[in-house]
Amino acid sequence: MAIYETVERRLTRAEGIHEGVWVCLTAPDAEEVREVSCQLDIEPADLRAALDPEESARISLEDGYTLIIVDIPVKVRDAGEGIYTTIPLGILLTQSLIITVCSVDTPVVSDFASCRVRGFSTRKKMRFVYQLLYRAATMYQQELRLIDRRRQELEKHLTGTLRDSDLMELHGLESTLVYFATSLRANNTVLDRLTRYKRLEQYPDDMELLDDVIVEIRQAIEMTGIYRDDIKGTRELFSSILDNRLNNAMKYLTSITLLVALPTLISGLYGMNVNAAGMPFAGSPYGFAIVCGFTLAVCAVAAWILHKKHML
């Protein structure tokens, strides 16, 4: 647990929980949850809600505080490039301070603790909420661009050997976009409800930032839809190329089988137990050489015909 406070426009660490501070809980243990719950009269279940990866984005008005849960992107460990999932970020607003709860250390929150966000103050609670949502929306867009860049890299493999790992990675990218689309729509719903709640104090500057957040989230939703269509097209292209390569392989195998069968057919005819007088070139001392030459000529003509028909 870390406690921050803005003093003279500078973010500093605070000694205890009091008015105007930001309580940052990252993967809190039971003792930290109990301490915050007792001091601020907040239900422990609400503090632990964001620690459940299955928790959906929502906003809830409780007695004495407001609970906001949104989804943020996080990279999947030990997965390929561009493979992400979403996890909940909990924001609790009381009359005097703000609390954030997350199961992992994420740039959405850590950028504020590292003073990388301008115009940030722990005392401006609603502005802080909108800045968190804005940071999450821009992070979605950054990850979406990385996903599309990785898709383009996979497309370059089409000219060479297509590996099973490429198909699995493409499936992972598509799954990531499904998670993003679902989470962004849920975040957009939470944002719409925030604009209608009169209980949350709003300022004109906050409303301008809120408009920016709405624009960024909608843009992220549009980007997700576009990139999903792109990946769908890439997947269909992969499938078409694999089918085409299989068809070509079958054509080559069929052509080679035909060329191998011609000498077998001719030699089989001469190997039958029949009267030699009825077999061409049977009486010639050069009969074997003539038959071999004729066989080669037939195979050469057949190979030329197959090549003209793009079967060899």
Q: Model-flagged regions — what are they?
A:
Residues D41, V215-L312:
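Hydrophobic alpha-helical transmembrane segments and their immediately adjacent juxtamembrane loops
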Residues M1-Y203, L209-D212, E216-I226, M311-L312:
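Peripheral, non-transmembrane regulatory/ligand-interaction domains of membrane transport proteins
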